[in-house]
From Swiss-Prot:
PROSITE patterns xrefs: HISTONE_LIKE
Keyword Cytoplasm attributed: yes
Oligomer and partners: Homodimer.
Name the UniProt record assigns to this protein: DNA-binding protein HU 1
InterPro entries: Hist_DNA-bd, Histone-like_DNA-bd_CS, IHF-like_DNA-bd_dom_sf
An example Gene Ontology molecular-function term: DNA binding
GO CC entries: cytosol; nucleoid
Summary of the function given for this chain in its UniProt record: Histone-like DNA-binding protein which is capable of wrapping DNA to stabilize it, and thus to prevent its denaturation under extreme environmental conditions.
Annotated localization: Cytoplasm, Nucleoid
Primary location recorded for the protein, binned into one broad class: cytoplasm
Amino acid sequence: MNRSELVAALADRAEVTRKDADAVLAAFAEVVGDIVSKGDEKVTIPGFLTFERTHRAARTARNPQTGEPIQIPAGYSVKVSAGSKLKEAAKGK
């Protein structure tokens, strides 16, 4: 499902216009991005998803073309965890 299909499904389910559903989805993504980028708190939707920023340590990897070792600097990544209700839905229960 792509963004436009998701917006259409949200609009139908919530009985709002596609424009309004798209605005809500865009605002949700922006708010989650802002909170996660600060890194001081998680965004949790109980039973559904949790978004949090994680620290990745510096590490040595290999260039896949040459096999030469390269240094990858420390940085941050985003961890998304499925909640219990989403896991149950994926199992078909």
